[in-house]
């Protein structure tokens, strides 16, 4: 009987799914389901830059290799086991440039 290990990407994806629902609503009004009113279905929130500005990002970005790299850097720098939301460790101008290329 062999053990099947989850890959790092699978583990990271599960962690991200958990915190997307848990952390995307800081400081915002929620509906009856607990989801933030201003975040459309199929999107999640990240916080970017020194000022931790809030951005709503489509879930489809999770498949992009550059975004996966940003998430890995976020996990290494901040971890995902906290109540602060997903913090992207890059300058806001760089994030906006990246996002404009893939959106």
From Swiss-Prot:
InterPro entries on file: SAUR_fam (IPR003676)
GO biological process: auxin-activated signaling pathway
Keywords: Auxin signaling pathway, Growth regulation
Pfam families per UniProt: Auxin_inducible
PANTHER family assigned to the protein according to its UniProt record, in alphabetical order: SAUR-LIKE AUXIN-RESPONSIVE PROTEIN FAMILY-RELATED
Family from the record: Belongs to the ARG7 family.
Function: Effector of hormonal and environmental signals in plant growth. Involved in heliotropism.
Note: SAUR50 is more highly expressed on the east side of solar tracking sunflower stems during the day, while an IAA19-like gene is more highly expressed on the west side at night.
Name of the protein: Auxin-responsive protein SAUR50
Origin species: Helianthus annuus (Common sunflower)
């Amino acid at each position: 009987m062999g053990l099947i290990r989850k890959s790092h990407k699978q583990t990271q994806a599960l962690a991200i799914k958990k915190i997307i629902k848990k952390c995307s609503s800081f400081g915002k009004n929620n509906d009856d389901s607990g989801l933030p009113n201003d975040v459309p279905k199929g999107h999640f929130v990240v916080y970017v830059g020194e000022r931790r500005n809030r951005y709503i990002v489509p879930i489809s970005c999770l498949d992009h290799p550059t975004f996966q790299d940003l998430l890995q850097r976020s996990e290494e720098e901040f971890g995902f086991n906290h109540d602060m939301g997903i913090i992207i460790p890059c300058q806001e101008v760089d994030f906006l440039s990246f996002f404009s290329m893939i959106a």
